[in-house]
Amino acid sequence: MRSEFPTRKQVEKQKKMETVKRLKSDWRYPTTLLCIYGFFSTVKPLEPFLIPFLTGSDKNLTTEQVNNQIFPVWTYSYLSVLVPVFLLTDWVRYKPVVVFQAITLFVTTAMLLWANGVPAMQAMQFFYGVVTASEVAYFSYIYSVIDLKRYRKATSYSRSIQLLGYTVGSVLGQLLVSLNLMSYRNMLVFTLVLTGIALLTSCLLPMPQQSMFFHRKHTRQTTTTEGIESHADGTVDATERTIRSKVSLEETTDINVEKSTEKEKEEGKNTDKSEDLETVGGESCGQVLVQLWRDFRQCYSSRQLIYWSVWWALATCGYNQTVNYVQVLWEHVQPSQNVSIYNGGVEAVSNLMSAATAYGIGFTEVRWDQWGELALGSFSGLGAVALFLMTFIGNIWVCYTGYIVFKCLYMMLITIAMYQIAADLSMERYALVFGANNFGALVLQTIITSVVVDSRGLALSIIPQFTIYASYFSVIAVVFLLRGLFTIWRAKRNKRETTSSDISDSPGFVEHRL
């Protein structure tokens, strides 16, 4: 007679399947995979030595070709695909774009290794622009597969691991170059292997069931507490402070949202998933875009947010231009064919010090709403001084030091700006403002590139370029210094008026008798 009870092997197999299922449903599983992808996709030992590689015997390109014909393509590519990739990322629910980013990064590295000539390198820069635009999928993916209460930890891990990858790549590249352990081409082969690992890891990521705009979580229940309305799809009114971020670490702190989300997950086991998700069809895509436009207008109706966003766009534009072309300046000051260079070590130090600066700013007790604009102007001025010293001193160690100082100042200020902007926005609106500010920075960067750098424009050499960048930050400093001084003067005037009003309105002395 056949036994109806499961055998020992069947029980063990069932336990293993349950264990695997439990691990995959835990928030650590997608976070770990994403961090592995983020690490291997950012370890690039050759990146600090890209100019010596392109202008050396491997590619035989001139500095003018790299500066005026090849590098500008990245800016144009990035601008042209940023908005389509941003919308497509949400439409296909993140993972396909993460995989696509890994594929294009692999193609970029392969072209850098095997392709030759200016047109081929321009095509390589185009693909790298697509890689950069696809970065939005990396930072957005994790929010669609974990609970709201895990946002801060997951964001911290995913951003920190990228910084670790860049730092490890820079240090590794410096060691390989300084000790003559590997040629530039072999370093690219090594990078290709790491990119292949990142590609395989991206394929293992779980597919999200929801997204921020086109596949929202749907529920009929809406809760209101103390006049603040919160919805189970994760959106909240703009008046609620739902994001407490040090370096754009988004975390919704509303308790009702967390409870409703957890309740949905428990009830979701007994209900059809189609009831929990509201997928936007083709007819509703226009409605989503209209809603995005309404949110955009409402976000930028705040004058304070506009000031911070203007600085964000202006400073990010100048920062990107400086970082993109700083290796050309280093090569001009001290050609790599003559002496040893330490680009990798400088990049590693700048990354670590920038991270420490951005982290430390979160523990400073300052009223940024009052003193923030003055800080933006003052530290932007220091950044301009660093750029002027890099441009005119003509010493490689001054260039290295100025670059580290400039990068630390920018990272500190962009952290303050991110926090101030995020303080009164829901996650969806913060993502919208974040994308709009970066798009504005990219438009400005494209204008500067086409006029100043491109061979079809002025095609200036590197010293006039950096003179313009330093002057650019000087203008930013003057504007925000004046604005900051005005803000402080107005705050003190309002305080005096309030004090005078309180004194004049206070009742006379009344004697109290027992």
Identify the role of each PLM range.
Residues S3, T7-W27, Q209-Y307, D502-R513:
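Juxtamembrane intracellular "pre-TM" segments in multi-pass secondary transporters
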Residues C35, F39, T108-T109, N116-A137, ...:
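Hydrophobic core of transmembrane alpha-helices in multi-pass small-molecule transporters
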Residues F71, T75-V81, R150-L181, R185-V189, ...:
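Glycine-rich segments within core transmembrane alpha-helices of 12-TM secondary carriers
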Residues L79-V118:
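Conserved MFS/SLC helix-loop-helix module at the cytosolic interface between two early adjacent transmembrane helices
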Residues S80-Y94, L175-L179, S354-G372, V453:
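Helix-to-loop junctions at the C-terminal end of transmembrane segments
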Residues Q101-G117, G129, S202-L204, S378-G394:
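C-terminal ends and interior cores of transmembrane alpha-helices
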Residues R185-L205, Q465-G484:
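Symmetry-related core transmembrane helices of the 12-TM Major Facilitator Superfamily/SLC fold
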